[in-house]
């Protein structure tokens, strides 16, 4: 589709993994995203999700799979602008879960088009690969993670036995990627997506509710949000959810090391400041 800017195109966001441009149009604003190779799957994935879930994914004007370009309509206001209200997640999470359930049918297609594979069966190997990297942790902490290797494999086996279908896992589901417009909540920025255990999506959501909103781990909101998210999946999944969050915390670290591998050396120090936080959250999950 051809669009004609009516003013200067401005850079809104420039990172090693993507550049985003603000494009003024006669009918409003569009957003152009050029993805780096590590996230080259995002334009096609976003377009496919929008085609199937137009009421919960931001509208795609067009995309170029070969060049990893994506053009989106203006999505509204991120809920971060309102302070990350838990009420927004209470409404959004069941709808996101329905999307995940529906996308389970398309897992093989997503994998074939480059969406990273973090299915539970491959996580033990991905964890071992993580530990082969030079990590921004002290020697004792790295040894704790290494010692945990056989236990992590056991936990993955336990989680797989619960029988939840693996599917799209956004892996960056926080207040800057959930937008409100016309009383609709839509998810965007699918560049961190993997095929993995669906429940692990809430690792990031819950982390930001703790860090940004200051909710303690035992706050009743976490139980309410968990139950709202699980409702489309069925009853009796509380224990499965807890196990998926534990395993998913390590899977999230594995996803981050994949991103880190594609960074230029000069960008790693800034990246590692957050990567260290993610690794420490994983360390906290090594205790039974």
Indicate residue ranges for each PLM-predicted region.
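Active-site activation/catalytic loop segments of kinase-like enzymes and analogous catalytic loops
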Residues: 185, 198-234, 246-265
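ATP-binding pocket architecture of kinase catalytic cores
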Residues: 10-13, 17-118, 129
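Active-site acidic catalytic loop and adjacent metal/ATP-binding pocket
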Residues: 10-26, 31-32, 60, 153-202
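Regulatory N- and C-terminal appendages and interdomain linkers associated
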Residues: 1-10, 42, 258-288
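Alpha-helical scaffolds flanking conserved acidic
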Residues: 239-247
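Hydrophobic core segments within long, regular secondary-structure runs in both alpha-
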Residues: 146-149, 153, 222-230, 272-283
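An alpha-helical support segment within catalytic cores of ATP-dependent transferases
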Residues: 1-4, 105-115, 119-170, 181, ...
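A glycine-centered beta->alpha junction motif in the catalytic cores
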Residues: 27, 71-85, 101-105, 125-136, ...
């Amino acid at each position: 589709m051809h669009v004609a800017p009516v003013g200067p195109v401005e850079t809104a966001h420039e990172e090693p993994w993507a550049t985003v441009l603000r494009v003024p149009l006669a009918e409003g604003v569009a957003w152009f995203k050029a993805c780096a190779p590590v996230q080259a799957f995002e334009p096609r994935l976003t377009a496919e999700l929008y085609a199937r879930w137009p009421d919960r994914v931001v509208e795609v004007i067009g995309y170029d799979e070969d060049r990893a370009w994506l053009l989106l309509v203006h999505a509204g206001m991120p809920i971060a602008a309102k302070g990350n209200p838990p009420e927004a997640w209470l409404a959004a999470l069941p709808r996101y879960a329905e999307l995940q359930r529906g996308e389970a049918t398309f897992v093989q297609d997503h994998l074939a088009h480059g969406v990273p594979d973090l299915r539970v069966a491959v996580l033990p190997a991905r964890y071992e690969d993580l530990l082969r990297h030079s990590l921004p942790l002290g020697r004792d902490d790295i040894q704790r993670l290494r010692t945990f290797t056989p236990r992590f494999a056991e936990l993955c086996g336990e989680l797989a036995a619960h029988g939840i279908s693996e599917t799209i896992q956004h892996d960056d589901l926080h207040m800057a990627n959930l937008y409100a417009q016309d009383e609709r909540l839509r998810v965007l920025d699918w560049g961190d997506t993997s095929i993995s255990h669906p429940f692990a999506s809430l690792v990031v959501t819950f982390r930001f509710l703790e860090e940004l909103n200051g909710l303690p781990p035992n706050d009743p909101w976490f139980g309410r949000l968990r139950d709202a998210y699980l409702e489309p999946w069925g009853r009796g999944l509380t224990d499965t959810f807890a196990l998926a969050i534990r395993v998913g915390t390590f899977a999230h670290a594995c996803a981050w090391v994949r991103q880190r591998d594609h960074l230029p050396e000069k960008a790693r120090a800034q990246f590692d400041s957050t990567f260290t936080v993610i690794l420490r959250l994983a360390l906290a999950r090594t205790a039974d």
